[in-house]
Structure formats: C-alpha cells, structure tokens
Amino acid sequence: MADVHELLDTWIENVTDEELLGELKAMREAGDEDAITDAFFQELAFGTAGLRGTLGAGTNRMNIYTVGRATQGFADYLVKNFENPTVAIARDSRNKGELFVKTTAAILAANGVTSYVYPKISPVPTLSWATRYLKRSGGICMTASHNPAPYNGYKAYGPDGCQITSEAADAISAAMNACDPFKDIKTMDFDAAVEQGLVKWIDDEVLDAYYDAVADKSVNNLTDEQIANAPLKLVYTPLNGTGLIPVTTVLNKVGITDITVVPEQRDPDGDFPTCPYP
C-alpha cells in the first residue's frame, strides 16, 4: 500500500461524503499520527466472514467506500459465476446499516444484479432464510455480530444461505484488489434502481414463512392446552438488537406468551448503551 499520508491526501481529494471528509480533514489538521496510521495502514481484509471493522474514514474502516469496493468485488464474482444473478440483503440494528444497504443495492443494480431487500432491520438468520427461500445467487447482511458498538460489518453468503466458501472469498478479494474505490465502482441512484425494478423489497410473507419454519422445529410433546396451562414464564432481552419481534413471534406461535422483556434493552439501538459487547 501507499504511504498513509499519501492515502490520506488521496481520500481528501476524492471523498464526497461530508461526514467522512470532515473526519479526514480533522485528522490531517490535528497531525494525529496514530489516528492516520490506524485508518490507513491496511485495507480491511475480505474473508469467508466478509468485512468487519470500526466505522469511520480510511481504508481500515467501515464506510461507504470500503463497502462499495467489497460490493463491486462481489458483483464481479456474481456476474462471472451466475446467469442473471440476484441477491438478498438485510441489516441489523448497528449504526450506518441502512446507508450501507442502500450503497450496496445501488452498486449491485449498476452491475445488473437485482437485490431483494428487507425494508426493516432483521436478524442474520432471516437473511440466510431469504437467500434460500427466494432462491437467490447470494446474500449480504450488514452486521458485526458480537463486536462493540463502534463496529459494523458486511457478511456475504452463498446461494445455500451459508457464509461464502474460501474459494469464493478469494475470488471476491482478488476482484476487490483490482478496484479503485474512487474510479472503478459502478453505481446508480438508489431510488432510480427501485423504480427500474433492480431493487425489490422483501415482503412479510417471507418472514411469516420463516417464523412458521422455526416454530415447526420446536421440540414439543405437549398439547396446546397443556402449554397454555403451564406456568412457564420467560425473561428475554434483545440487547438492543433485532431479536424482539422474531423471538417473541416464534415463542407466541409455540404457546409461550408470558414473556418479560428487559425494558432498557428492548428497542434497537446501534449504540448499545447498556451492553458494550452485544
């Protein structure tokens, strides 16, 4: 890679996102060598788990440019290996998730790849489900799993709903390495992509089918009446993530309705104020 200061200058010259540009200029004006080095000493590596890193400006950060580079690499891989490729996309409650989803879908659309997007936050398993249920060529989920709040990530999935193989990851990584984030990424307006049918919304039927499938897998030898009369009480916390609706929906389906949700951790919040490591 180029010198970190050269990379900083290149990014300042090319970045159009105002928030990231402000961060870059502040770095340079402060002469913060530690911050500059940490932001640019490497590029986020793409592997079988995709990308993961802290949010911010630089090659070693999760931002629309590093996400864009990964998406262009994934698009190149899909176009090469699938006829009329399609992708399912989801995001959890982490910060910048919606921005990254729209960035990703717009780039895929510009490459001729149609995206099927969950309109609201969804847990990772629902992305795997949609990829298989809708018979898509791949899937992408914006999530950083258990990492602290400053992180986000970009997980890529194969048509089987599993994380991509090492062979696929290597091919995507090679395509990324040949991609300049400011010159080589194809993109288009997100709303235009929706209007042209290159971005479609995943409807509730897909989630309903998922909930039914999970409920059908429950191990239960009791009748509905026995379940209703059982003194079973649960305490549950979504940890400010995406689990509230899916978990309580499935529990209700199998007859468990007396559920106390921890109020401080009930609602989605990408800052995870009560749980530094969700």
Specify the residue positions occupied by each region the protein language model found.
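Basic/polar N-terminal segments that are highly enriched at the extreme N-terminus
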Residues: 1-9
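An N-terminal, well-structured beta->alpha segment
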Residues: 8-104, 111, 193, 199-234, ...
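Gly/Ser/Thr-enriched, mixed-charge loops and adjacent short helices
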Residues: 11, 15, 19, 35-39, ...
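Long, contiguous hydrophobic alpha-helical segments, chiefly transmembrane helices and signal peptides
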Residues: 46-51, 55, 67, 74, ...
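Short, glycine-/Ser/Thr-/acidic-enriched flexible segments
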Residues: 51-53, 58-60, 94, 122-123, ...
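Residues on a specific face of well-ordered alpha-helices
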Residues: 72, 102, 106, 125, ...
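N-terminal small/polar loop signature for handling phosphorylated ligands or for N-terminal nucleophile
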Residues: 83, 88-151, 253-278
